[in-house]
C-alpha cells in the first residue's frame, strides 16, 4: 500500500510540472498582414505569474552591473533563487511594479555589465514589446539536453535574454545578435526555446539550446520569415537545414563543431538539420506540437490542403512558413489561438469527453492506474488532443509593429488575460507611461477582485459547467468590447499622432496611456458583472431569466444514451427483468 501511495504521489508531482512546457507563437510578415504591420503572438500556457508589468526606461551609472535572474519557466520554480511560485521576479531594479512587498527577493544567478540607458518595455514571463516596437513571442521546445542553471557557467534562459534585448536594442537583427553573444559568453540553461523577434520592418525566428549538462555556452540559430508569410511554432524546434552564409540565417559559431563532437551530426550526412540534431521531437505525446502547427497553417492557408497526419516528429510536411490565403488581422491571429479544432475530426467540443454541454477543456495529467493482485499500478494508456486554446493559459497577446507611425503609437500589444477562447483583447501602446494596475496584479494564489486575470479566470472556470450555453453569453460581451476597440483605434491614434506632430510627445503618450487604462477598468467591472449574471442565469443547472425561473435545461439524447440513462429506475423490476 505504501508503494502504491508513493507511486501515485510521484505521478502527481511529475504531472503538475508539465504545464510549464507549453506555448504557441505566431509571426506574420508585413506583406502578409492586412495593414502592413509585422505581428507577433504568444500564448503563455503554463499556470504561473499571469501579470503584464511595465518596466520603465532607466539611466545607469558608469560601472553598474545588471542582475540576471532565474526563470521559473525554464525548469519550474526553484526556491533557492528567490521570489515565489506565483511571482516571476521580485526586485527594485526593474521599477516599482516588480518591487513587491512581503515576498522574498529574487536572487541573481550572475551579473553582466549594465549599459548607460535601458528602454521601457512590457514584460511578462517573457519580454513582450519595448518602446521602439521591438516585439517578442515565445514557445518552449524539447531539446536533447536541458542543463540546470549554474552561476559562472550557465546564467541565461530565453526569458532574461528577451528582457535584455528589449532593454538594449531597437531592431530584430540587433536583438538576435545580442542574445546570441550573451548565450555564448555567459552560458545557457533550461529547455530548448523558440523566440520570435520582430520590428516594424521584419520578423525572425531564433532557436536555442544547451548541449551539455555540465557545459558552458549554448547553441543558437535564427531564420528570417519572408515578408509575405506566416510562421507558427508550438513546442518543437521549427528551423531545419542550416545554410552557410545565407542572408536569411544567423547562427552561433560553434553550431557545427558541437554537433560533430557530440556525435549528433557529420558533414557527410548532409545539411545540419537543427530541429533533428539539437531537438528531441515533441513534448508529451505524438501530435502535441504538430497538430497545432497543422491547424494554424490550415486556418491561414486552407488552399494548401495540409494533412493532419504525419510520418513522425521530424516531418517536413508542414513548411517553415506559409503564405496566407488572405491578409491577416489581429483578430485573425487571435482566432487561431482561440481554436479547439472546431469543425475537424479532432473537435474538442464534440464527443463523450466534452460532456453534455460541449466543453472543449481536457485536463492533463497521468491517468489513474488500476492495481493488479500484487498492488502494482497499470496506467491507462491514451491521450487527448492538445488544442491551441488550452485551459491553463494565463495570458495571450498579439503585438503590432507599424513602420509608418512613431514608435510610441505604432507599437500595440493586444493583451488577453487567461485562456484565449474566453479572453478579451485590450490594446496597450508602446509609448505608454504605465499599465493599468489590474493588469499588473495577477497572483494566481490570491483571490483578488482587482485582478484582471482573476476576473477572466473565474468566468472561464465557471463556464465549464454549461459551456455550450455560457460561451454564447461570454462571446456576446467579448465581441462588444473587441469590436469597440478596433473601431476606436483609428480615431485614437489620429488624436495621438496630431499631438505628436505638434511636438507634444508627452501629451500623446498620456492620451494613449489614459485610454488603455480606462478601457481596461471598464472591462474589469463588466467582466465581474458577467460572472454574476452567469451565476444567476444558470444557477442550479436551470435557465433563469425575467421570463421564467428554473426553466429546465436537460441533457442531449445522445449523451443520455451513452451514460446509461435508459437503465435508470423506470420500473420496479430489476434491470434484467424489465419488459
In which residue ranges do the predicted regions lie?
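Positively charged n-region of N-terminal signal peptides that target proteins for export
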Residues: 1-4
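Bacterial N-terminal signal peptides
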Residues: 6-17
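A contiguous strand-loop segment
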Residues: 23-157, 178-328
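Second-shell loop/turn segments in exported
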Residues: 148-152, 160-169
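Glycine-rich, aromatic-lined ligand/substrate-binding cores of catalytic
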Residues: 254, 258-412
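Histidine-centered catalytic/metal-binding microenvironments
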Residues: 478-579
Amino acid at each position: 500500500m505504501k508503494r502504491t501511495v508513493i507511486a501515485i504521489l510521484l505521478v502527481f508531482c511529475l504531472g503538475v510540472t508539465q504545464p510549464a512546457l507549453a506555448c504557441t507563437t505566431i509571426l506574420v510578415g508585413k506583406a502578409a498582414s492586412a495593414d502592413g504591420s509585422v505581428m507577433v503572438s504568444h500564448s503563455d500556457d503554463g499556470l504561473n505569474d499571469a501579470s503584464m508589468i511595465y518596466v520603465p526606461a532607466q539611466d545607469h551609472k558608469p560601472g553598474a552591473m545588471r542582475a540576471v535572474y532565474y526563470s521559473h519557466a525554464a525548469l519550474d520554480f526553484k526556491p533557492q533563487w528567490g521570489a515565489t511560485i506565483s511571482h516571476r521576479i521580485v526586485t527594485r531594479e526593474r521599477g516599482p511594479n516588480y518591487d513587491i512587498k512581503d515576498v522574498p527577493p529574487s536572487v541573481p544567478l550572475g551579473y553582466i555589465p549594465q549599459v548607460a540607458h535601458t528602454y521601457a518595455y512590457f514584460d511578462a514571463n517573457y519580454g513582450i514589446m519595448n518602446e521602439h516596437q521591438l516585439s517578442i513571442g515565445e514557445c518552449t521546445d524539447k531539446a536533447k539536453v536541458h542543463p540546470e542553471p549554474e552561476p559562472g557557467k550557465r546564467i541565461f534562459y530565453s526569458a532574461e535574454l528577451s528582457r535584455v534585448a528589449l532593454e538594449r536594442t531597437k531592431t530584430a537583427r540587433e536583438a538576435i545578435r545580442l542574445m546570441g553573444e550573451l548565450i555564448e559568453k555567459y552560458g545557457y540553461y533550461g529547455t530548448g526555446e523558440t523566440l520570435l523577434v520582430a520590428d516594424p520592418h521584419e520578423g525572425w525566428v531564433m532557436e536555442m539550446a544547451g548541449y551539455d549538462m555540465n557545459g558552458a555556452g549554448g547553441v543558437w540559430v535564427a531564420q528570417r520569415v519572408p515578408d509575405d508569410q506566416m510562421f507558427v511554432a508550438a513546442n518543437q524546434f521549427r528551423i531545419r537545414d542550416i545554410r552557410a552564409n545565407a542572408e536569411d540565417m544567423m547562427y552561433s559559431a560553434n553550431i557545427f563543431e558541437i554537433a560533430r563532437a557530440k556525435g549528433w551530426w557529420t558533414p557527410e550526412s548532409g545539411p545540419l538539420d537543427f530541429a533533428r540534431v539539437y531537438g528531441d521531437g515533441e513534448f508529451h505525446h505524438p501530435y502535441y506540437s504538430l497538430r497545432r502547427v497543422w491547424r494554424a497553417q490550415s486556418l491561414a492557408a486552407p488552399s494548401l490542403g495540409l494533412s493532419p497526419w504525419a510520418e513522425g516528429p521530424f516531418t517536413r510536411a508542414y513548411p517553415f512558413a506559409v503564405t496566407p490565403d488572405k491578409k491577416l488581422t489581429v483578430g485573425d491571429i487571435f482566432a487561431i489561438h482561440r481554436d479547439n479544432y472546431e469543425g475537424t475530426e479532432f473537435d474538442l467540443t464534440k464527443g463523450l469527453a466534452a460532456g453534455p454541454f460541449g466543453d472543449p477543456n481536457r485536463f492533463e495529467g497521468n491517468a489513474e492506474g488500476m492495481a493488479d493482485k500484487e498492488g502494482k499500478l497499470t496506467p491507462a494508456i491514451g491521450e487527448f488532443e492538445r488544442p491551441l486554446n488550452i485551459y491553463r493559459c494565463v495570458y495571450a497577446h498579439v503585438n503590432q509593429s507599424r513602420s509608418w507611425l512613431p514608435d510610441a503609437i505604432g507599437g500595440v500589444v493586444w493583451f488577453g488575460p487567461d485562456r484565449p477562447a474566453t479572453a478579451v483583447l485590450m490594446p496597450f501602446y508602446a509609448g505608454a507611461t504605465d499599465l493599468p494596475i489590474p493588469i499588473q496584479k495577477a497572483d494566481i494564489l490570491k483571490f483578488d477582485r482587482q485582478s484582471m486575470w482573476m476576473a477572466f479566470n473565474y468566468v472561464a472556470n465557471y463556464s465549464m459547467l454549461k459551456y455550450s450555453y455560457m460561451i454564447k453569453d461570454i462571446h456576446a460581451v467579448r465581441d462588444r468590447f473587441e469590436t469597440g476597440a478596433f473601431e476606436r483605434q483609428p480615431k485614437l491614434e489620429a488624436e495621438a499622432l496630431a499631438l505628436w506632430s505638434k511636438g507634444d510627445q508627452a501629451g500623446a503618450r498620456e492620451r494613449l496611456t489614459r485610454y488603455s487604462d480606462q478601457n481596461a477598468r471598464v472591462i474589469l467591472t463588466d467582466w465581474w458583472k458577467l460572472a454574476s449574471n452567469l451565476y444567476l442565469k444558470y444557477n442550479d443547472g436551470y435557465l433563469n431569466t425575467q421570463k421564467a425561473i428554473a426553466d429546465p435545461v436537460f441533457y442531449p439524447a445522445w449523451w443520455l444514451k451513452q451514460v446509461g440513462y435508459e437503465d435508470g429506475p423506470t420500473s420496479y423490476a430489476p434491470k434484467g427483468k424489465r419488459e
